[in-house]
């Protein structure tokens, strides 16, 4: 079939297998060009391995550190007449390139929040790797079914305490949109913490430790975003922020148990704002990102997922002098938080109107990166060619 982008709101409901493969190849080429990372992990579990930062971590571990990788994700395959998800095609491409390099790659498709998928993962580690020495936690999901109670939690993107006047960019109509976001109820805050907080990360590490599949000295990190004051009302001070603060609490207990396990470590890693399927769903982020891209590109400091994660590995996860803040988080977002960058974004924020969107922002760059996520708009791909949407992932365990 011939696959074209079909965008509905903040999601593209189609994905292009050849484009997704080219996108993965581009990230692998970046890591290969930057060179090997010393003292890297050799057996890595990536929870949330198919898109965005999780995919970038899997690529960096494999092609930067020479690691065998086991990936967990929840994606949909293509079938006749219907494309699969971009994460499915990304993972198929990753497996293909890892095999060419002689690297072990196995993936598990299912709900990472469930006990069943945790057990399948443990079984795969025991059978193939023995143990893992690094666990990357990079789940982005709007809902979670609690494995012990069966209760279904849905996350909410809302402020806490007071309603917030929100400036945003309607990416469909390409106009500036002013709206009022009502504050979250306590129940919505609790649900968001249940979905996006640290409980599941802790459950994973506890399960892996109990099963004896974490190597002594193993490290784990969960990815997060903090941002600056422009995004704080909806982000750090909002319901998502409550979940992020829960990560900061849960990491302390995880760190303690890993430290006792042969001197291991657990850290929250703070990464910059990038275009992902998760970030495009957050009100105000498309406008913020369009402005941030413009300012950072002009300064020559613009980075995407792979640049961020490669430097996180090289400098902090595997380096001797990690970028760490007072709370003990690893920081890779310092170029975004450069006061000069934030001041310029803040000034432009108030000046943007429908008439000057294309002059004051890099909305063109935002749209391009958004389509790239789904394998569209990639140089060298023939989008008029007939492609088979049914792409198999070798070494896939279906949960």
UniProtKB/Swiss-Prot annotation:
Does the keyword Cytoplasm feature in the UniProt annotation? no
> Belongs to which family?
Belongs to the TER reductase family.
What role does it play?
Involved in the final reduction of the elongation cycle of fatty acid synthesis (FAS II). Catalyzes the reduction of a carbon-carbon double bond in an enoyl moiety that is covalently linked to an acyl carrier protein (ACP).
Query: Which PANTHER family would you find in this protein's record?
Result: ENOYL-[ACYL-CARRIER-PROTEIN] REDUCTASE [NADH]
Q: Does the keyword Signal apply?
A: no
Which residues are recorded as binding NAD(+)? 48-53, 74-75, 111-112, 139-140, 244, 274-276
Q: What is its EC number?
A: 1.3.1.9
Enzymatic reactions? a 2,3-saturated acyl-[ACP] + NAD(+) = a (2E)-enoyl-[ACP] + NADH + H(+)
What controls its activity?
Inhibited by 2-pyridone derivatives such as PT172 and PT173.
Annotated active site residues, numbered on this chain, are: 235 (proton donor)
Q: Which residues form a coiled coil?
A: none
**Matching InterPro entries:** Eno_Rdtase_FAD-bd_dom, Enoyl-CoA_Rdtase_cat_dom, FabV-like_NADH_b, Trans-2-enoyl-CoA_reductase
Q: Name one GO biological process term.
A: fatty acid biosynthetic process
Name the species this protein comes from.
Yersinia pestis
Q: Binding residues for substrate, per the UniProt record?
A: 225
Q: Name one GO molecular function term.
A: trans-2-enoyl-CoA reductase (NADH) activity
Q: In which pathway does it act?
A: Lipid metabolism; fatty acid biosynthesis
Q: Which UniProt keywords apply?
A: Fatty acid biosynthesis, Fatty acid metabolism, Lipid biosynthesis, Lipid metabolism, NAD, Oxidoreductase
Assembly information from the UniProt record? Monomer.
* The protein's name in its UniProt record: Enoyl-[acyl-carrier-protein] reductase [NADH]
Record site: Plays an important role in discriminating NADH against NADPH: 75
């Amino acid at each position: 079939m011939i696959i074209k982008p079909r965008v509905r709101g903040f999601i593209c409901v189609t994905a292009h297998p050849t484009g997704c493969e080219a996108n993965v190849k581009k990230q692998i080429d970046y890591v290969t060009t930057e060179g090997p990372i010393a003292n890297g992990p050799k057996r890595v579990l990536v929870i949330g391995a198919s898109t965005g930062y999780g995919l970038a971590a899997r690529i960096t571990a494999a092609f930067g550190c020479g690691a065998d990788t086991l990936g967990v994700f929840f994606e949909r395959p293509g079938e006749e007449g219907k494309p699969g998800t971009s994460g499915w095609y990304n993972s198929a491409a990753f497996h293909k390139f890892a095999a060419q390099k002689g690297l072990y790659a196995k993936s598990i498709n299912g709900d990472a929040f469930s006990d069943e998928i945790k057990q399948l993962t443990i079984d795969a580690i025991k059978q193939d790797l023995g143990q893992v020495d690094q666990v990357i936690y990079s789940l982005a999901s709007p809902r979670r079914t609690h494995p012990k109670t069966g209760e279904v939690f849905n996350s909410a993107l809302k402020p806490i305490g007071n309603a917030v006047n929100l400036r945003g960019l309607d990416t469909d109509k390409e106009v500036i949109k002013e709206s009022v976001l009502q504050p979250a109820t306590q129940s919505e805050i609790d649900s968001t913490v249940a979905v996006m907080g640290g409980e599941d990360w802790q459950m994973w590490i506890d399960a892996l430790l109990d099963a004896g599949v974490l190597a002594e000295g193993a490290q784990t990190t969960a990815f997060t975003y903090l941002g600056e004051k422009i995004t704080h009302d909806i982000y750090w001070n909002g319901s998502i922020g409550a979940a992020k603060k829960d990560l900061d609490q849960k990491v302390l207990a995880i760190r303690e148990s890993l430290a006792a396990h042969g001197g291991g470590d657990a850290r929250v890693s703070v990464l910059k704002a990038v275009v992902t399927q998760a970030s495009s769903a957050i009100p105000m982020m498309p406008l913020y990102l369009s402005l941030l891209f413009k300012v950072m590109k002009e300064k020559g400091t613009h980075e995407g997922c792979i640049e961020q994660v490669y430097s996180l590995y090289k400098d902090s996860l595997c380096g001797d002098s990690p970028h760490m803040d007072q709370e003990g988080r690893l920081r890779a977002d310092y170029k975004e938080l450069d006061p000069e960058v934030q001041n310029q974004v803040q000034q432009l924020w108030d000046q943007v109107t429908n008439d000057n969107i294309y002059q004051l922002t890099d909305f063109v760059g935002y749209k391009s990166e958004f389509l790239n996520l789904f394998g569209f708009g990639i140089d060298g791909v023939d989008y008029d060619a007939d492609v088979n949407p049914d792409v198999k992932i070798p070494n896939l365990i279906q949960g």
